[in-house]
Amino acid sequence: MKAHPHMSLPALCALVSRYIVRLRVATCAASFVLPGLALADGSTPQIPGTPAGHALVAWLDAFNSGDSEKFASFAKVHAPWMGLDQEKALRASTGGYDLASIDGSDNLWIVFHAKTRVGGSRVSGSLVVRLKDPEHITLLNLVPADSKSAEIVLDEAERSRVIEASERLLAQFYVFPDVAKKTVAKLEALRKRGNYRSITDGEVFAVRLEDDLRVISGDKHFRVDYFAKEMPPFEPSSRPHPDPHKLAADNCGFEKADHLLPNIGYLKLNFFTEPAICASTAIAAMSFLADSDTLIIDLRDNHGGAPGMAALISSYLFEEPTHLDDIYDHTKDTIEQSWTFPYLPGKKLTGKTVYVLTSNQTFSTGEEFSFDLKNLKRATLVGDATGGGAHPVAPHWIDGHFVIVVPFGRFMNPITKADWEGTGVEPDIKVPAADALDEALKRAREEP
């Protein structure tokens, strides 16, 4: 993310439209003030003394400080995925933010207006913390104030309609019918209790509903998305395909293929893309690394993607056709087997030592890849346990503003029928994710 000191506010806000951070916050009931923090009109801000309020104060304090070391320390502890250069550029462009008003709040969310210290442009912000872990910010969203004013304001009828539609889709498509029934009952109880009554912001409502679905069901693959601009609904089978030009710009998720030492290959893979679009990139990367004695595959920042690409890369590691895993589809009541590819261009890496680096951010298809290679004893996993999401999903439009993503199946080992849902994939060598590469390199150097 790059910003310029004189860029327009819409362009600036586009950079941070889905800005997610993680903080450590406390809980209390009273309002409080932060020394040195003032409202845009010079008065003292009264921020609710709630988890959401504490989170807002903590972020503003770190962001507005202008102290690179302070922000680096903050990011290291609370938001290790944040790019310090990006934050520095954003801070230079805005000069920081002064609160203009607190427009609505609850324990877990807060909506506010702020002004940039450079130019005095108004932005609307919304922040949501997680229900089960209020130290974790689920959403921090900043958009131009004029664009926010054009959004719909949710009323009770709209909120109820979205929740009831979500309940119907959950009952129809969710992979575990018994869990779906219990989740629907608890969600309906929350609605009748008035848990969503004060939420009029679409983005906040979507995130709160998503969080409740995940907590009640225990399934991290649930997602609820909100679109301020009304979108034309589409069926899951006809949803837009990935943009090949954007994928090419991102190198199809292959961040780096390199030789760290003459005999140690390194592949940094951040997401799995469809082989129909990106097979040539995968083939080029694996061919480049084919002569390595040891291969390190870094999935610490891999959040998932297409299972077909995971199977393609796995195919370079096995000599014979190999049954990788099974995928159960609840909507069709079928089991689809995943095997390595029978033919591949280029050399294979059979017989070579393989390490896979994992973290708690490794998710979904990244976990499938790790799970398969571990169970087949084809790789040694190094790092932290993975995120714990083993369910493929499909989107369902509720209307032109809301879409719910429902898990409809599950990956599983073809022999044990086990998966990693909720628990993650445990590494063979457990070390902090930040130390995983050094640990793998150390062990690779010690190999005969």
Feature-to-residue mapping (PLM):
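N-terminal secretory signal peptides that target proteins for export/translocation
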Residues: 1-22
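Bacterial N-terminal signal peptides
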Residues: 22-36
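Short, low-complexity N-terminal intrinsically disordered segments enriched in polar/charged residues
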Residues: 39-68, 146-165
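Short, well-ordered alpha-helical segments enriched in acidic and aromatic residues
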Residues: 62-82, 183-189
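Extended, small/polar residue-biased N-terminal targeting/export presequences
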Residues: 83-110, 177-262, 448
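Exposed beta-sheet edge and beta->alpha loop/turn motif
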Residues: 96, 103-153
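Solvent-exposed loop/turn segments at secondary-structure junctions
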Residues: 144-147, 228-232, 271-275, 301-307, ...
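Gly/Ser/Thr-rich loop/hinge elements
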Residues: 304-353, 391-398, 408-414, 424
